Regions:
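Noncatalytic alpha-helical scaffold of FAD-dependent oxidoreductases
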Residues: 1-151
Length: 151
């Protein structure tokens, strides 16, 4: 499973130590760094508000799924997730397996005035999968279970 707060998979160790020379160069160029606190997944899950969505068979509303779909992979996203400074989450996440299910979800979103965020691999670095604060509920549609493109 993909890391909830960074690149890689949960079973990968991507930890690297900076050499003393590189650390000195970075300090000379940008100043001394300040380490962020490291939040646990459970700490971030505890911050997830109640969903504003009604039950739907294709939509997951559990807090962990919502955390895992709350941000992309930009540096600001990493810093927010790593430190636990996340303030918006989708209200629900759907993982359709067919074009019929996608149509059903979009019709449901239209009928219920939901904001829809399309989610591919979750690697966005431009912020478009991050829910903005809104009075309308947010539905993220994760296309990860779709296995082909049709023309």
């Amino acid at each position: 499973m993909r890391l909830w707060n960074g690149w890689g998979n949960e079973d990968s160790d991507l930890t690297m130590e900076l050499s003393d020379g590189l650390r000195a160069l970075l300090e000379a160029l940008v100043g001394p760094g300040t380490a962020l606190s490291q939040a646990t997944l459970n700490e971030v899950i505890a911050k997830v508000p109640n969903t504003r969505l009604d039950d739907h068979p294709l939509i997951k509303t559990d807090p962990e799924t919502r955390v895992r779909h709350a941000r992309g992979q930009s540096l600001p996203d990493w810093l927010e997730m790593h430190s636990g400074n996340v303030d918006t989450f989708p209200d629900g996440v759907a993982l359709p397996e067919s074009s019929e299910q996608v149509r059903e979800l979009l019709a449901h979103a239209k009928e219920n005035n939901l904001i829809v965020i399309p989610y591919g691999g979750g690697t966005s670095v431009v912020g478009h999968i991050n829910p903005e604060t809104s009075d309308k509920p947010v539905l993220t549609i994760d296309m990860g279970k779709m296995n082909s493109m049709l023309s």
